[in-house]
From Swiss-Prot:
PANTHER family: MITOCHONDRIAL IMPORT INNER MEMBRANE TRANSLOCASE SUBUNIT TIM22
Organism: Neurospora crassa (strain ATCC 24698 / 74-OR23-1A / CBS 708.71 / DSM 1257 / FGSC 987)
Pfam families assigned: Tim17
Disulfide bonds: 38-135, 154-173
Protein name in the entry: Mitochondrial import inner membrane translocase subunit tim22
């Protein structure tokens, strides 16, 4: 099927592949080389992590309002408010559900945006860190096997948990390495079609 502006028909023998794609074109080779660089992989993983984290954070924030643990908005909380006002006798917090609809929506969207952005930053950091480390390890070892993902997972987990001390870094290393090994092993399984 041909679409307007798209080349159609079969490729001549020995020439370009179907659709006008020539794998020997120097521009295509340059683009492939750029996309295979560690920098490009890290940036793409960080961007994909940011997008996925934003959607995930928005979804989780939308589910948080039906729990009794959600902190309601109170008068006097916000920029310039006195946090000690909660200890004043007679001070009663205003429940979110008793506010006007416009205020509820304003609070809900603001909270969703903050949570979504926070989750997006975290996913981007994890994705970029793991991808960059894995690509670096793959370049050093000159192999593409399960060991790269396990080592990258260990280093990523340890780096993310470094502020918790050496024990937290060891647990982070073990957890990320195990998760990475499980996902990588599943991704490398032969398909049912093979």
């Amino acid at each position: 099927m041909n679409f307007p502006g798209m080349p159609g028909g079969a490729a001549p023998s020995g020439g370009a592949a179907p659709g006008g794609y020539d794998p020997n074109d120097p521009n295509i080779k340059m683009m492939q080389k750029a996309m295979e660089s560690c920098f490009a992989k890290t940036v793409m993983s960080g961007g994909a992590g940011f997008a996925l984290g934003g959607v995930f954070g928005m979804f989780m924030a939308s589910m948080a309002y039906d729990t009794p643990y959600h902190s309601p908005t109170t008068p006097g909380t916000g920029p310039g408010a006195n946090p000690a006002a909660a200890g004043i006798p007679g001070y009663k917090p205003v429940d979110l559900s008793s506010m006007p609809l416009k205020e509820q929506l304003k609070h809900g969207f603001k909270d969703m945006g903050q949570r979504s952005y926070s989750t997006a930053k975290n996913f981007a950091k994890v994705g970029a860190l793991f991808s960059g480390i894995e690509c670096g390890i793959e370049g050093l070892r000159a192999k593409n096997d399960l060991g790269n993902g396990v080592a990258a997972g260990c280093l990523t987990g340890a780096i993310l948990a470094k502020n918790g001390g050496p024990q937290a870094a060891a647990v982070g290393c073990a957890g990320f390495a195990a998760f990475s090994a499980a996902i990588d092993a599943w991704m490398r399984m032969p398909s049912e079609e093979d």
